[in-house]
Amino acid sequence: MCGILGGTNKNWNYKEGIWSLHHRGPDAQQVKEFDDCTLAFARLAIIDLSEKGMQPMTSLDGTVSIVYNGEIYGYDFLKKELEKKYLFQSNTDTEVILNAYLEYGEDFINKIDGMFSFAIYDKRKHQIILYRDRPGIKPLYYYHANGQFAFASELKALVTGCTDVKWDMDYTALYDYLFYQYIPEPKTMYKNCYKLPPAHRLVFDLKEKRIVSIKKYWKMHVNTSKGIYRKEDVLWDELRTI
């Protein structure tokens, strides 16, 4: 696993924030400042151990950058399709996501399968776009208040890195934890800080300084025509025989 972090306030301590994710990415850490935001990455080198696999990774035309944690299944097949148009500098699935986004736009997410959470900085649109995998295997948190925005693989990276933020406890989340023994999404223990739900896409506009959309990009299809749903007494009888 790797760790990702990013935000809009250039005065935040991204080095300390990404170092707090050292256990997720012990091989290397890197912070890179862009025009509208800062991206940081803690690397666990698995695919393409060379420096070419380091993140944040930027497209060859310089318009789109990414920080990514996860694994894309069968990415080689998509890479072969994209190689007809794009020149690849690495053997990573990270670069496949990057070029798929350039080629297909929002629809690129339908081309990939796997466990992932990542952030794309689109310089052309002045947007940060977050994605989380369909089953929610890889975590992704975000903070938004007073026009400021940040995201990270773990909550403590936000608390450590966003140095001027007042982290007030959300007591409704505390109640949920005491009642359910966990905090339901999208809440976290802090106000203005949330978990991005599984299979969701978030778009933050860097010019307007606001979240313009949080949308579900995938929905599980259940085939009800094969007798999955049966009468309650039948189900109870089956349960007793187990």
Language model region names:
Residues 1-242:
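Cysteine-centered catalytic environments shared across enzyme families
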